[in-house]
């Protein structure tokens, strides 16, 4: 594993929220919390933007205990693709959803910290590992590329694109 792609929770800018606890996120996605003022934000109805089952949702279910068996509110809007979720974040004033941090960086949507931890931190609990699978014998070009991935210039590129380099 050379990097992680964090799965970030994103909100529309009008919510007034910049940090949520794991429990608050579960309460929001289950429908127990329905207004942003209940979690320190503005008096605005929450619009849950969910995703169909897939790697992002599996990562959340695996790493947030309260999300493991959670039934998403029936009022949720489902977005098939990241682009749909980005559009929802910009269209619906009270929206919340989740997506890879690389998409957050690419589209400039608002990510919240999770229990005070930003998605860019190595301690952030939600992420998908990235690695390489290769044959035992490497060509000189492949060896050079794998060596480059471990350098600081490559790590800078990873950070700028919403990936978190993993230190061995």
Language model region names:
Residues 1-168:
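Exported/periplasmic ABC-transporter solute-binding proteins
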């Amino acid at each position: 594993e050379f990097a992680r792609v964090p799965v970030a929770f994103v909100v529309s800018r009008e919510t007034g929220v910049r940090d949520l606890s794991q429990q608050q996120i579960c309460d929001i996605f289950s429908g127990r919390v329905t207004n942003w003022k209940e979690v320190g934000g503005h008096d605005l109805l929450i619009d849950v933007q969910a995703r169909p089952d897939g790697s992002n949702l599996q990562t959340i279910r695996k790493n947030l205990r309260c999300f493991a068996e959670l039934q998403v509110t029936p009022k949720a809007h489902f977005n098939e693709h990241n682009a749909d979720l980005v559009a929802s974040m910009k269209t619906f004033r009270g929206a919340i959803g989740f997506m890879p941090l690389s998409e957050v960086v690419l589209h400039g949507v608002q990510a919240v910290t999770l229990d005070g931890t930003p998605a860019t931190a190595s301690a952030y609990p939600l992420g998908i590992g990235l690695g390489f699978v290769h044959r035992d014998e490497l060509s000189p070009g492949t060896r050079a590329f794998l060596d480059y991935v471990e350098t600081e210039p490559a790590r800078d590129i990873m950070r700028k694109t919403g990936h978190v380099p993993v230190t061995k």
